[in-house]
Swiss-Prot record:
Its main location: cytoplasm. Residues 4-78 form a coiled coil. Homodimer. The ends of the coiled-coil dimer bind to each other, forming polymers. Interacts with FtsZ. One of its GO terms (biological process) is FtsZ-dependent cytokinesis. It comes from Pectobacterium atrosepticum (strain SCRI 1043 / ATCC BAA-672) (Erwinia carotovora subsp. atroseptica). This is Cell division protein ZapB. The gene is zapB. Non-essential, abundant cell division factor that is required for proper Z-ring formation. It is recruited early to the divisome by direct interaction with FtsZ, stimulating Z-ring assembly and thereby promoting cell division earlier in the cell cycle. Its recruitment to the Z-ring requires functional FtsA or ZipA. It is found in: Cytoplasm.
Length: 79
């Protein structure tokens, strides 16, 4: 009877070891996913900064063109 108890205990220990091993593998996969996502976030932040700078530049160019257009319209009204 004690041998049966020992076998049951051994099976439970083995099951616990298997579960721990699977969880460790899952943790490693999640760490890799986390690293990939972190890199994606950094890349997106860099792209965002670039787009913000480009947007500001385009706004400045728009203001310049609007001023030129107003000047031309003013000259046309004078004629």
């Amino acid at each position: 009877m004690s041998f049966e108890v020992f076998e049951k205990l051994e099976a439970k220990v083995q099951q616990a070891i298997d579960t721990i091993t699977l969880l460790q593998m899952e943790i490693e996969e999640l760490k890799e996913q986390n690293n990939t996502l972190s890199q994606d976030v950094q890349a997106a932040a860099g792209s965002r900064e670039s787009l913000v700078r480009e947007n500001e530049q385009l706004k400045e160019e728009q203001v310049v063109w609007q001023e030129r257009l107003r000047a031309l319209l003013g000259k046309m009204e004078e004629v």
